[in-house]
Amino acid sequence: MKKLAFAITATSGAAAFLTHHDAQASTQHTVQSGESLWSIAQKYNTSVESIKQNNQLDNNLVFPGQVISVGGSDAQNTSNTSPQAGSASSHTVQAGESLNIIASRYGVSVDQLMAANNLRGYLIMPNQTLQIPNGGSGGTTPTATTGSNGNASSFNHQNLYTAGQCTWYVFDRRAQAGSPISTYWSDAKYWAGNAANDGYQVNNTPSVGSIMQSTPGPYGHVAYVERVNGDGSILISEMNYTYGPYNMNYRTIPASEVSSYAFIH
C-alpha cells in the first residue's frame, strides 16, 4: 500500500543506527500514493507546519513522486534502529497507527502482519503489541479495484479531502483495505449519492469495509465499518467526530439505529 523512501538505508542485512546528529538532520522523503502531509509528519515525529515551512508549501497538498524535506527525528518507532532484515521483533501500537503504516515501516505486507498476529480484521488498538514477521516482502501500493457490486468505477486517486476530517480518514482507510474510492465525492453528506452515481452499491445494510454515511449537520459524516456484531450492532472507526480534526476513535452503533444510516459498499 504505502511505502516510505528513507535517506538512511541498511546494507548487508545490518541495521542502520541513528546518531543524535542524524536524528536532527533533514531527511528526504518521496511521497507515495495515498500519503498526506499529516501521515508523513506522524511517521517522522514532526508536525505538518514544520514540513510546510521546510519545503515552503502554501497548502497541505502533496503528490506522488514529490520529494520533500522532513526535519525532526526519524519515523516513530519503539527504538532508534531500523528493523533488521530476517529478525523477528515486536511493535507497540501508537494512537493513530494502522496496519498499513506499521507494515510499511517494517518492510512487510499487511497480510503477513495479520497472519503473524492471527488477526481477522484491520482493527488494532493503541498499546496493543504486534509481532513483526521475519523477512517480509514489503508493503504494496494501493491499486484500483471494482466495488463489491462489480460495477463501480476504478480509482487510484491522491487524497484531496481536507486533512484531519472524516472524509480524509475514510478515503485512506478504504485505500488501506484495498478498496479505493473517489477523491471527488465532496462533503460527507453527498457521498451516498455520488457513490451511487459512480456505480457503488448503496443501501441500509452494513458490511465489514463499507462506509457508513449520515447527513445531519452542515457537512454530514462518514465512518468506516470495522466489524458487524452478532447482535446487529456495528463497530466503526471515524475521525473528527468527538475529539476534533486528526483524532480517530472507535464507536459502536446499536442495532436499533443501524438502518437509519446509508452504507456504501
Curated annotation (Swiss-Prot):
Domain LysM: 27-70, 89-132
SMART domains registered for this protein in UniProt: LysM
Coiled-coil boundaries: none
Extent of Polar residues compositional bias: 74-92
Keywords: Antimicrobial, Bacteriolytic enzyme, Cell wall biogenesis/degradation, Hydrolase, Repeat, Signal
Range of residues in the leader sequence: 1-25
Region annotated Disordered, chain positions: 72-92
GO process terms (BP): cell wall organization; defense response to bacterium; killing of cells of another organism
Protein role: Has weak lytic activity toward S.aureus cells.
Protein name per Swiss-Prot or TrEMBL: Probable autolysin SsaALP
